[in-house]
């Protein structure tokens, strides 16, 4: 079942409660969802979807996935995302601005926290996204991924994105193209700029790279290359492990 909550709604999910289904905030404003209960479908998919909405606050709940699409002013605090199925991304931000993820925990079977431009019917770039005080555990793909989608016929920009005070517990990705605890891989004519990774602790992981900053063209998901990567700050990042694959920082090779 799907529950749609209109503007001005406050929802409390009590500790110990389990909601089987989806909660949608679609085209709404001033919505608050909080509590200590769980929200997830009976199977795969997002427990909560925030789409084309403004001034949404979500606190404390446990979900399967919680994507944010074409929104302004969304704040997630102390939210936990746990998924086990393919393409089980945790907290993806699509075409949105002024988004804060604070104190979240993600253990996911795909990207834990990702920031994209146009995709899945959402239009535009992403701007002013802050992820802080978070714990990320990727069973496949990336703990952090930026820029992989955009409008190949447009000029999308993903900019002013900060990841600060983050613990990365694991990465276990066999495919080189999808490795990187810290990944910036713009495609589809997207420009990524003004990115900060600060005070990040990376534990020993099973399979992957520390860093993958690469202008990419992945025909599986994109139809063109990205426009570029500009102004990236990596500060106070530590790694407590060994055996990682070689990190990659690369532009696009036109000969490929």
Regions of interest found by a model, annotated:
Residues 1-256:
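Extracellular/periplasmic carbohydrate-active domains that bind, remodel
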């Amino acid at each position: 079942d799907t529950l749609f909550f209109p503007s001005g709604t406050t929802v409390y999910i009590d500790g110990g409660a389990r909601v089987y289904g989806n909660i949608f905030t679609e085209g709404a404003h001033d919505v608050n969802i909080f509590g200590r209960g769980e929200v997830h479908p009976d199977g795969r998919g997002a427990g909560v979807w925030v789409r084309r909405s403004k001034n949404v606050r979500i606190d404390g709940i446990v979900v399967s996935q919680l994507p944010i699409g074409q929104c302004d002013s969304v704040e997630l605090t102390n939210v936990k995302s746990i998924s086990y199925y393919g393409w089980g991304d945790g907290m993806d931000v699509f075409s949105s601005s002024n988004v804060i993820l604070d104190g979240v925990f993600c253990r996911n079977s795909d990207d834990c926290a990702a920031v994209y431009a146009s995709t899945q019917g959402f239009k535009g770039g992403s701007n002013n996204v802050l992820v802080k005080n978070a714990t990320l555990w990727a069973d496949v793909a990336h703990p952090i991924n930026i820029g992989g989608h955009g409008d190949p016929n447009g000029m999308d920009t993903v900019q002013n994105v900060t990841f600060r005070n983050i613990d990365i517990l694991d990465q276990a990705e066999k495919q080189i193209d999808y490795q990187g605890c810290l990944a910036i891989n713009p495609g589809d004519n997207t420009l990524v700029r003004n990115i900060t990774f600060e005070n990040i602790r990376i534990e020993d992981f099973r399979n992957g790279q520390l860093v993958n900053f690469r202008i990419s063209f992945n025909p599986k998901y994109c139809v063109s290359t990205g426009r570029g990567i500009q102004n990236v700050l990596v500060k106070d990042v530590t790694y407590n492990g060994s055996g990682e694959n070689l990190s990659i920082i690369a532009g696009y090779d036109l000969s490929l």
